[in-house]
Curated annotation (Swiss-Prot):
It comes from Escherichia coli O157:H7. The gene is recG. Transmembrane segments: none annotated. Monomer. It comes from the Bacteria. It holds the Pfam family RecG_wedge. One of its GO terms (molecular function) is ATP hydrolysis activity. This is ATP-dependent DNA helicase RecG. InterPro entries: ATP-dep_DNA_helicase_RecG, DEAD/DEAH_box_helicase_dom, Helicase_ATP-bd, Helicase_C-like, NA-bd_OB-fold, P-loop_NTPase, RecG/Mfd, RecG_dom3_C.
Amino acid sequence: MTGRLLDAVPLSSLTGVGAALSNKLAKINLHTVQDLLLHLPLRYEDRTHLYPIGELLPGVYATVEGEVLNCNISFGGRRMMTCQISDGSGILTMRFFNFSAAMKNSLATGRRVLAYGEAKRGKYGAEMIHPEYRVQGDLSTPELQETLTPVYPTTEGVKQATLRKLTDQALDLLDTCAIEELLPPELSQGMMTLPEALRTLHRPPPTLQLSDLETGQHPAQRRLILEELLAHNLSMLALRAGAQRFHAQPLSANDALKNKLLAALPFKPTGAQARVVAEIERDMALDVPMMRLVQGDVGSGKTLVAALAALRAIAHGKQVALMAPTELLAEQHANNFRNWFEPLGIEVGWLAGKQKGKARLSQQEAIASGQVQMIVGTHAIFQEQVQFNGLALVIIDEQHRFGVHQRLALWEKGQQQGFHPHQLIMTATPIPRTLAMTAYADLDTSVIDELPPGRTPVTTVAIPDTRRTDIIDRVRHACITEGRQAYWVCTLIEESELLEAQAAEATWEELKLALPELNVGLVHGRMKPAEKQAVMASFKQGELHLLVATTVIEVGVDVPNASLMIIENPERLGLAQLHQLRGRVGRGAVASHCVLLYKTPLSKTAQIRLQVLRDSNDGFVIAQKDLEIRGPGELLGTRQTGNAEFKVADLLRDQAMIPEVQRLARHIHERYPQQAKALIERWMPETERYSNA
């Protein structure tokens, strides 16, 4: 294998990678050894030294070693195994909700155990829930890690340990194979080489300052951030050039349907909505495809803007497709559009992954014949077997869940008779202007900066978890005395959907016991779509008082009677995501409240962030504050808003680099076209395909 380029070495050549693991790795776009080396850690854990159990502080992640004192299984309410260990300085209780007989047998009294996890304050002193542990052999000194331990973004069925072992093999290959240096010499001078940077980031020595890594300031990160931002900018330059070569159906003014809808509405559009609709209509009258991003705060009325844009296309006898990220949100859109469009004689179709057999077939036939003019659904609407009949406009709701390459794939799927559909992309995640210019440089941007009248601002309070019982009483009062409904949102910092679902289930059990007089529902990401739909429908119809949920309810769910939201561990989420969640209440005329139920002690930055939410309901103000206050160790921004197009760069954190990166990208685009193409291929392979279209 000596001398080969690592972008040509498949992962199947690594020890332990068979067909099943290859398929799982492909789900996170890992196909070659180069892909794996560019799959960088989300964060790091310091497992290089031991903490005395007696000195553990709540909230600290630590490695401890101790002798097993006892290990017991209890069956009260929920099966649980507890194991107590001691190192002489104190006693730690390890708590497991998922365990096997083999685990119980391995933790025999007298055995020595090395454990890593988050220390918490329990009923009987220090405890860790589901720590990682290893039973020690006869060695007098524990086997500690020699480098900081990386935590990678992963997918179901791929463990951290697997990714770490595979990455070790990939790093060894750097000695015998090559990874191409693509930066022109005048740029890379004085910088770390690519192999050096990759070794440092995958296996940082314990002497390296964690704060440097957490703030993205380490030279190894700067080397890769520069390359990734350049690739992103180069891809935007290529896409802009490519888009101008496409043709779209020009849709001139035809306002009969629009005027009918406006006359039937019980309210008048805001000035901001009217301005944005005018910008969209100007674009749609041209013979090149519109590519416009509409930003609007939670509840600003983006759906009406989308409806008015859709009517322009339908008035010309064309079809419109609206794609939402979840079936939950797509179904809600379908209902809204039916209420508005059916009185105008417009048929609204609905396509989602859960549809099977005859229902799906008849819906596909209605779309292919042109009987259905407005099609609403999830990504299922762009599957191979769906044939459109004159598709002229594609609306994508919640852009941050669809990557650049996904929105470009819609061009390909929607193309008919040489015409490409116009594209309208809507997001409720406000982005400060400088960042929007970079993240969406291939799009024109409109902003709905005005809320409709009659919305009640949500009152937000931050309360420590020690007052949990008071909050449960507050939920009881809201649901029974006031006749309202409430959300209880569980958050988890882990990248595992399974652990998040388990946390939500545990909270659901707890609240059912504490509130026997309430009907309590549960919704999380691992439930089947049909189960989620059924629970949400029950909540919307008022059959459930309280909904325990993970962050799956972040987007678009609309239940006007819900006036109270509890968010557990809000310190784990970014401001934008907290603001999105809070937007699920305050959708009716009644006063609404959001309780941020935090664990103590709070970091200084977390305190400031929660204060921002208490002080403001304006998403654009909150986005700007997010830029100003994000402190060390809090990797928010692109990863947490779901913009997975960036592996190492963070548009919020790295914004100071953006003007220079834009200048350098133009230089490379003009002077080094081959390197430009290779950079896009390395960092954004899907986009590269479309920029050649």
